[in-house]
Amino acid sequence: MCPGECKDRMADAFTKFGRVPILRRTRVAPPDDPAFRGRTRAPFWASGGLVHDGRGHVVFVRTGRPSAGGQWFTPGGLLEKGETTDAGLRREVREEIGIELTDPVLTRIIHEALTDGDRTRHGYFAQFIARAGSTELRPGREVVEARWFDALPDDLAFRDDYQEDFSRVRTAARF
């Protein structure tokens, strides 16, 4: 378990959504990866996931960040100090695509150790499924394109992480 605010976020998420799987992995990152910027070694947290319309469609975004490489992403991003995983999800989705969410469900937490060989930084990603309160997309300033899909795009970042959740959305199991 992680210390301090990290532990508080984890406890809050489990209290609200029940215990979910925690997937652990290590990823090699280049020395200029944003995770290594700054002096903090505290774990970082992000929230995101599949935002669906209730009819099996999910929304993905493309950002203008060069590091994104033109790939599609789920809406989401880094949490602010003191922000809970679900509050961060709602804020990020509102900022990125202009949509309010209903009934977010936490499906897993991914604990990733990023290393460049010399340094290691830990991050936690709270992965959700949530229903969109509207289907009208209003991309924010960081988003260059937002679109509804009825399948996972081949160039979706972290595509394998979303296979199971997408299947749940498509079959409307529990949602």
Predicted features, each with a name:
Residues 94, 108-116, 146:
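Glycine- and small hydrophobic-enriched segments that form the cores of compact globular domains
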Residues 50, 60, 127-129, 148:
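Conserved hydrophobic/aromatic beta-strand scaffold that supports enzyme active sites
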Residues 53-55, 110-136:
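Active-site-adjacent beta-strand/loop module that shapes the phosphate/pyrophosphate-binding cleft
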Residues 127, 138-170:
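NUDIX/MutT-family hydrolases
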